[in-house]
Design a protein with these regions (language model features):
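Short alpha-helical segments that sit at the start of domains
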Residues: 2-26
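Conserved segment of winged-helix/HTH DNA-binding domains
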Residues: 12-13, 17, 34, 75-95
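Short capping segments at the starts of secondary-structure elements
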Residues: 23, 35-39
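Pre-recognition alpha-helix immediately N-terminal to the DNA-recognition helix
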Residues: 26-30, 86
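Alpha-helical residues within the helix-turn-helix
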Residues: 45, 62-63
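Short, hydrophobic-biased segments on the C-terminal half of alpha helices
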Residues: 58-59
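Beta-hairpin "wing" of winged helix-turn-helix
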Residues: 63-73, 79
Length: 95
């Protein structure tokens, strides 16, 4: 592997780790694991946080490849990716 590929791999890992490096984001992943297809409003209400905060965390999770967004006629629904499931399993090993 050359240096450029190595740098790219490290940046990819950094983006992934930054995606779940917040307790609220981990909570959101747990919520979506138990109840997929939630809207931003649903998640905000479940966690007792404001809409804007929930939306920002979901955006960061999506950038990290941990959450997928699906648009329906009324709202955008979110679900975790298989990568997020691995992350949650990994985090459980650290408890």
């Amino acid at each position: 592997m050359n240096r450029e590929q190595e740098k790219k791999n490290y940046r990819t890992l950094e983006r992934l780790v930054r995606g779940f490096s917040n307790h609220r984001r981990i909570q959101i992943l747990e919520v979506l694991k138990k109840a997929p297809e939630q809207s931003v409003d649903d998640i905000a209400k479940l966690l007792g946080i404001n809409y804007k905060t929930a939306a920002d965390h979901l955006r960061r999770l999506a950038i990290a490849g941990l959450v997928l967004k699906k648009s329906d006629s009324v709202s955008i629904r979110h679900k975790i990716t298989s990568r997020a499931e691995y992350v949650l399993k990994f985090l459980r090993t650290l408890e």
